[in-house]
């Protein structure tokens, strides 16, 4: 992308804001160098990564990051066998610690946050165990070598502290005792890394030892008394050994780090990438920006787009479209109406999207991925070259014409301005014709009325204007696509009190062609406002319809789940009954087998036959059980079958199998998605029979089979809660509004369980104790939604 467009559209302001939101120095540097990409796949990947961090930031919160220095200079030194200093190793420890913390942070991320797109980055956060362990034991983030780095270092530091205490105690005898009168001040200080006292010059001989320094006046000598010479010598020796031990430790740590140069570089790079992406996510949140959708035909559809550098409380959102029905847009009208800002908004949002940033526009806004974006906006004449505004303008356009192609977005402010209006308009038309032949996407602003007709008589070209409020005599800054702009001079003059005869005379002086154009524009304005009002009404109605459809689908899904639950329960009960009867039948047969060789009384045989016949009848009853029959029928439907959709009470034809248990059914002119539990296959004989008028009596039938009262008295707690759950399901299916739960008073356990269940249920509107004459505290009245 050319640097000029970045400057014209103030892209640097965006990268500055991005860098300010980054935490680490490498990420800030990366933000400052951010440039738009012209590679579609790269842009798509960048936007998806920004989306991943946006979701993570919204759901989980900010990554545990803090600032660290670039590790590349350190790893480069390791590569040439150099040893690192303590500060460099402390920075490496910080980098590894951050990687470890982020790994732990992401361990319990909500499954709703899809981080697949950044897996290659996260895979680099593999912390080398040995290096991390040794660094953590030996050094802190500021580069301070710890006592735990080695046992020798710990011993030396203990000896240093002990010897230092001895020195201070010895020196205290000089500052606190009789010798203090010979001192300039009663203090102990250090010169040349040795402890000394400030002795008055005339009392030098009182102390012996070594003079290390003197004051500027020469009146004070800094003397190391002879009594502490050995202690100071020992201290210096211990300190020298400590420094040597620290060098050994740093060398040891550097050798370990040298084995993990690639890992260190990868981890630092991954942390930088995560911080950079998180900064993008923060910027999106700050700007209330949304994910742009990419188009492969280079079309733009920015919905309620806002210029990101204008005060959010003052900026006016605009719908900006280019591509699709038209590739060239001419924005006409007077100055200060917002034409230039509209151009800059389209261009800057396009640059942001191609940089992997979210854009300040509504969701589902679309942008292309352009190879180049060119702009000629504002007066950029060069004083050094002594060029006029028009010459500078032409130089920019000539440069654009040399490079333009079908993958180019061209933005030109006041095309052809700065010269004779007639010549300028002709030149503007010719330039536009050339750019259109190159299949570029073009947005231009102009004052020339001749270009209003250009928008009508050229294919894939449209006019646009900035709306003007005649009541307030001020621009609204709203873009109107399809309507050319005009000056509104006569209307403004009238509003300001100009004499009517003067205004009318001015109107008569206009050419018929200009007058006709203005009338056409006024008519288009009225039609557009009417169309906008109608569209808003339709969008509102569509939104309501979609929400209603969603609610109905949710209700249908809930209904199917409840029906399935009831069927499963019925099947379970049937299986239990069959198992018990089989067990009893087997027992009877076994008894008969045992007694076949023994004389049996006739009445016993009759009783046994009666029991077997009874079991057979019960089995037959189960075989004819409507619930189980329906269950069986529902599992035997296929594409083309005529079925009855139970939830609608209507018939239709299965047109598609969506999944193992879901089908698409055509009912008249509509198609619905249903579960196999919600359909009954219709035999051909039934489908060819004379159609009957459908009567929706389902609710009435269900109500007749459902009781408005449930008695839980005398039941165990678990049994009562199970029965309560099943009862609520059944009354919901039956459509009852109010029911009574009798739980008694007793210990209160059942009542507490009932109330806890009702509080947690989404289907309960409210509940309270029954009136005194209907059970009082021993019963609860429940109102269902």
From Swiss-Prot:
Q: Which PROSITE patterns match?
A: DNA_MISMATCH_REPAIR_2 (PS00486), SMR (PS50828)
Q: Which organism is it from?
A: Lactobacillus acidophilus (strain ATCC 700396 / NCK56 / N2 / NCFM)
* Subunit-structure text: Homodimer. Binds to stalled ribosomes, contacting rRNA.
Q: Which SUPFAM superfamilies match?
A: DNA repair protein MutS, domain III, P-loop containing nucleoside triphosphate hydrolases, SMR domain-like
Q: What is its EC number?
A: 3.1.-.-, 3.6.4.-
Tell me which residues bind ATP: 333-340
Gene from which the chain derives: mutS2
InterPro entries on file: DNA_mismatch_repair_MutS_C, DNA_mismatch_repair_MutS_core, DNA_mismatch_repair_MutS_sf, MSSS, MutS, MutS2, P-loop_NTPase, Smr_dom
Name the record gives this protein = Endonuclease MutS2
